[in-house]
Regions:
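Structural preference for beta-strand elements that scaffold enzyme active sites
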Residues: 2-6, 46, 106-110, 133-134, ...
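Histidine/acidic residue-rich metal-binding segments in metalloenzymes
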Residues: 119-129, 153-206, 219-233, 256-272
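Histidine/acidic-residue-rich catalytic or RNA/ligand-binding cores of hydrolases
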Residues: 15-20, 57, 146-149, 196-201, ...
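A metal-dependent hydrolase metal-coordination microenvironment
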Residues: 31-33, 38-122, 140-179, 192-195
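Mid-to-C-terminal alpha-helical segments outside catalytic/metal-binding sites
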Residues: 290-329
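Conserved, mostly hydrophobic/aromatic
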Residues: 8, 39, 92, 131, ...
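Short catalytic helix/loop segments, enriched in acidic residues and glycine
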Residues: 19-41, 297-299
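Short acidic/histidine-rich active-site segments
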Residues: 240-241, 268-292
Length: 329
């Protein structure tokens, strides 16, 4: 069985929403696509759990993004602490490997929506101290740091935003994230912002849950140039299982298409640039990989499409582990 590191899921925000509504919310077993039982069945060693925050919804409620994300952090930590023999929080590759040796799963805390920092570096430091080790700059809203590549309707022209780059505050955040050891995640960020990140930084940059724009025209996917740049920097791209990022006009997230994106990225940037970023529990559409327990089916399709066992090991865990070792000291 191939070991799995998944760079992105939205399980915790969904559970937190249920919790706040008085519903049952358990990381051990739930109605989503990721829980501890399924992770063990699927061969996982680490799941990166995003603290996804919807700025639009918070604005309507009059709720502070930073206050909201602190609530998510507390809920996340409570869930992890409830099952100490099964899973443990990690902030380094070494602690992840130690958990694996003890037969435990690992959980890494990540941020999806740089607006939670409210433009204040002290909030970045506070979340770092709580264990955040990966962060996007945006989700689907402009914020104090930068601008997203917006969703587009089918048939709309592909016009990436090459004008509105990172704000001055965003540039300061990127430099500080690299300095203190938070993985810079360019998923959701517009092309101009990604360009700025490559100009400002020196080490690995990742896209935790993005695919190739040439194969699927959604602007959330990466241009060929950005795929190459991530590879040249020693970063990784987590393949996203959502059908809307896999193929134009698709009805179900097909495993075959996931591997086609891998093949394309391999040809542009090399096998070392590919990882997994399921986006599980961040979409409701049909997916052949219906949950974490199905992950070895992806390995079987990779074998069918002529990936070697060594290459599958890299994509499933070793490439992400290499980046963690490089950045998360």
């Amino acid at each position: 069985m191939y070991r799995v590191i998944d760079l992105h899921c939205d399980t915790i925000p969904n559970m937190y929403s249920d919790f706040r509504e008085g519903k049952e919310a358990s990381l051990l077993s739930n109605s989503g696509r990721i829980d501890l039982n399924r992770m063990r069945e699927g061969g996982y060693i680490c799941q990166c759990f995003s603290l996804f925050t919807h700025l639009g919804a918070l604005k309507k409620r009059g709720e502070s993004p930073f206050t909201h994300v602190l609530g998510l952090v507390d809920f996340w930590k409570t869930q992890i602490a409830e099952y100490p023999d099964i899973i443990g929080q990690v902030t380094t590759a070494e602690s992840m490997e130690e958990n694996a040796r003890m037969g435990k799963l690992s959980a890494m805390m990540t941020v999806e929506e740089g607006g939670v920092y409210e433009g204040k570096l002290e909030n970045l430091y506070a979340l770092y101290d709580k264990g955040v080790r990966m962060s996007t700059l945006t989700w689907n809203f402009a914020n104090e740091l930068g601008y997203p590549n917006p969703a587009i309707a089918p048939g709309s022209p592909r016009i990436p935003d090459m004008v509105n780059g990172l704000t001055d505050t965003g540039k300061s955040f990127v430099e500080e994230m690299e300095r203190i050891g938070i993985l810079i995640d360019v998923s959701h960020l517009n092309d101009a912002g990604i360009r700025d990140i490559f100009e400002l930084t020196h080490g690995p940059v990742i896209a935790s849950h993005s695919n190739a724009r040439t194969l699927c025209s959604h602007l959330r996917n990466l241009s060929d140039n950005n795929i190459r740049m991530i590879g040249e920097r020693g970063g990784v791209i987590g393949i996203n299982y959502f059908v809307g990022f896999l193929e134009d006009g698709g009805k179900i997230g097909r495993i075959e298409k996931m591997v086609e994106h891998m093949q394309y990225i391999k040809n542009l940037a090399g096998i070392d640039a590919i990882a997994l970023g399921s986006d599980f529990d961040g979409f409701g559409e049909l997916c052949e990989l219906s949950g974490a327990e199905k992950m070895q089916q992806l390995a079987a399709e990779m074998e069918r499409q002529s990936f070697s066992s060594a290459e599958i090991d890299k994509v499933f865990s070793l490439n992400a582990l290499r980046v963690f070792q490089s950045v998360l000291s």
